[in-house]
Amino acid sequence: MTPTLVVILGPTAVGKTELTLSLAEHFNSPVLNCDSRQIYRDMKIGTASPTPEQLCRARHYFVGQLSLDDYYSAARYEQEVLSLTAELFKTHSTLILSGGSMMYIDAVCNGIDDIPTIDEEVRTTLSARLKEEGLDTLLAELRLVDPEHYDYVDKKNAKRVVHALEVYYTTGKPYSSFLTRKTLRNGENISQSNIRPFNIIKIGLERPREELFSRINARVDQMVNSGLLHEAMNLMPHRDKNALNTVGYKEMFNVLDGTWELAMAIERIKKNTRVYAKKQMTWFKHDQSIAWFHPQEKESIIEHIKALL
């Protein structure tokens, strides 16, 4: 049997965890978590990390293993997953990867472009310029030095705009010149160097919009009742870390600063989480290789996977 990676994906709060555990038990597989925030050990409540009981049902990887001081990226995740799967496939024919971090899933399935290491002086300079001159100034600069990437980049995402300029000022070459990987409209990767030594089956989970939004609101209430504000208070000294630039913590930091009332923060968390869920679905729906199911269709999902093994 050809080694197969089953990727369970979908928006936040859709119900990935329970289905993933059921599939892991059925296929006798560990779980490769794919959440760029759950990988940090001090962010359990705000990221809805797996509970101790859930962790006992299957061996988990990439959960709570990093400190907030550790830098992590989709490129590092890709390499670590490939290294881990090479070992796990020696004893497992099927592995389950589950999560909603779009760039991380894409990195594992399709590979990631080989971006040069950024010069720290360049990074520091551009970070300062962003604060002093604002995003619009840097966007205008990117348009001049790399018009191709300017047309493509999310112009509201300061991190991505700055990163493109970091690459340009580090190498003297436009960021777009390093982006060699292309994808077809049907989602199939055409870069031969990125073909994986295992099959990939993508299972997308979706619910009706109002059902999903209701689950998101309920999850936020549960987080608050479980001590999200207290967790955020403990993380306040580290609030400048990139890992904490995350829905849930950002809003609670405003409460702790005295800027917002708790009720306002809770409503903002719900709203921002709903926005993020819509962004996830927009991203995933572009990939026509994903087979979509309601999370309660477990038997249909199992049959679909078995038919492709």
Located regions from the model:
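Phosphate/pyrophosphate-binding catalytic cores of soluble transferases and nucleic-acid-acting enzymes
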Residues: 1-309
